[in-house]
Amino acid sequence: VDLSEEMLAVARRKIEKQGLEERIMLEKGDAENLSMVATDSIDAVTVAFGVRNFENIERGLSEIYRTLKPGGKLVVLEFSMPKNRLIRWVYSQYAHRLLPRIGGMISKDKQAYTYLPDSVEEFPTPERFSDMLRAVGFSRVKARSQSFGIAYIYEATK
């Protein structure tokens, strides 16, 4: 599910290239309102760098939980603020000073690269996000640090 038809087109091409059209379903829509998806009907959901863009994270997670079959898996890859002070400082310098300049020059959209670090800083800590997953009903919640804590992979089971 994605709001962007362009992102879905990219996904379709990749799915076709791998011959997975019969196994993967794509829908244009809002992850916080999955009314087009039946309850207990999905085997797995993956989200890469998208949960922090939800307007209401709890609502989005609840919808994902509703659509997953019992035993279904959720895997989320999301940015995070590193816990180590030195790494956090280096990351913040890069994200707030260098990234908007370089990204703005390449894409001509500096605002998008200003939004990115702000949204990362506002995203819940790994502990808090894990608690949010449990609060909507997920079990076997795991959070694994990647790249010195700049990103995390979260796994959860319905």
Whereabouts are the PLM-identified features?
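Conserved Rossmann-like nucleotide-binding pocket used by diverse enzymes
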Residues: 27, 46, 75
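A short SAM/SAH-binding and catalytic strip from SAM-dependent methyltransferases
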Residues: 43-57, 80
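Class I SAM-dependent methyltransferase SAM/SAH-binding core
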Residues: 1-34
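A short acidic, Gly/Pro-enriched loop at the edge of an enzyme's catalytic core
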Residues: 32-45
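Short acidic capping loops at alpha-helix termini that bridge into adjacent secondary structure
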Residues: 21-24, 40-41, 71, 140-141
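A short glycine-rich, Lys/Arg-flanked "PGG" loop and its adjoining helix->strand segment in the class I
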Residues: 58-73
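Core SAM-dependent methyltransferase catalytic element
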Residues: 130, 136-158
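C-terminal alpha-helical "lid/dimerization" subdomain adjacent to the S-adenosyl-L-methionine
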Residues: 77-136, 142
